[in-house]
Structure formats: structure tokens, C-alpha cells
């Protein structure tokens, strides 16, 4: 299995396994990533607290809650470190509800393939609309682009200095 396929498989299985566990702790699993870093493999979870901030206590709580299930399921073929953190200022946007929360703010969106006219894959601008099938992003000097959720490869809140 290629590293890319391994990464995707682990992320999909981990998301399906861990999302309900994190929800059971009263928190939200915003995103996760499985990647190889200099020190080895890392499974990194990004959690959020509805209506509040995530602190060290919540990260520890989630780590302790998910660790036994990861050990029992044992689907990760490499030794890895588990990291749990808040999504940070450039929080990932994965679900329609994530986009709803940041409507009117600056976002950065990458698509799987070219979208819009003129066609492009990278969009940085104001999130102006969240509809049933996608979002609209107003890019300064280029207009407003409608992007379907299925076409979004990656999206983040863009921190404003």
C-alpha cells in the first residue's frame, strides 16, 4: 500500500472510530491527520468545545478516551504518537456546520480540480454564503465563486493580522 493510500485509509477509519467517542466527551472532532514527520508517524486530532475554548484538560480527556479504542482496533500498521490539540486560529473547515460558524470571515479553500471562471484551484476570500451543496467565496479582484462541498480538498479559516 502506498503511503498516500495508507494515510487516507487510516484517517477514514480513525475518523469513523473516534468521532463518536469524542462526541461522548461533549466535544467535537473537527479534523484529524495521519502523517509521517521527522520523529515518526503521528495521529493528530483537532478538537473543539461548542461555545468554549479547548484547554489542556480537554486534550488530556480526549487522549485518554480514544487511546483504548485505538489499541483494541489496532488498524494502524506503524508505531505512532497520538497528539490532541485545539484547531487553532487557522482551524480546518470540513463540515457544513464548520463553514456556517465562520460565515463572513476570511477563508482559504483548495479544490481537487479547477473551479469557476476563470478556472482556479486556490481561493482566499470572504465566505459569503453556505448553501445546501456548497459555499460561495468572494475573492478580492476576481469576483464570487461557488464551490461545491464535494470539490473541496482542504479549507481553513484564514487568520487576519
Swiss-Prot record:
Cellular localisation: Cytoplasm
Any single biological process term in GO: translation
Organism for this UniProt entry: Myxococcus xanthus (strain DK1622)
Gene, per the UniProt record: rimP
Stored InterPro entries: Ribosome_maturation_RimP, RimP_C, RimP_C_sf, RimP_N, RimP_N_sf
Keyword Signal among record annotations: no
Family designation: Belongs to the RimP family.
Record keywords, A-Z: Cytoplasm, Ribosome biogenesis
Protein's UniProt keywords contain Cytoplasm: yes
Annotated function: Required for maturation of 30S ribosomal subunits.
Protein name: Ribosome maturation factor RimP
Top-level taxon of the source organism: Bacteria
Annotated GO CC locations: cytosol
Amino acid at each position: 500500500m502506498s503511503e498516500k493510500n495508507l494515510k487516507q485509509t487510516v484517517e477514514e477509519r480513525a475518523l469513523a472510530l473516534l468521532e463518536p467517542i469524542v462526541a461522548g466527551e461533549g466535544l467535537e472532532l473537527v479534523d484529524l491527520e495521519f502523517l509521517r514527520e521527522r520523529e515518526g508517524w503521528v495521529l493528530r486530532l483537532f478538537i473543539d468545545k461548542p461555545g468554549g475554548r479547548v484547554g489542556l484538560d480537554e486534550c488530556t480527556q480526549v487522549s485518554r478516551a480514544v487511546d483504548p479504542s485505538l489499541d483494541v482496533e489496532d488498524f494502524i500498521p506503524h508505531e505512532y504518537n497520538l497528539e490532541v490539540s485545539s484547531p487553532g486560529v487557522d482551524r480546518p473547515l470540513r463540515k457544513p456546520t464548520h463553514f456556517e460558524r465562520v460565515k463572513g470571515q476570511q477563508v482559504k479553500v483548495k479544490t481537487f480540480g479547477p473551479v469557476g471562471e476563470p478556472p482556479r484551484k486556490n481561493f482566499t476570500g470572504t465566505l459569503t454564503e453556505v448553501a445546501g451543496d456548497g459555499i460561495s467565496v468572494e475573492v478580492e479582484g476576481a469576483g464570487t465563486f461557488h464551490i461545491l462541498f464535494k470539490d473541496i480538498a482542504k479549507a481553513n479559516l484564514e487568520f487576519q493580522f
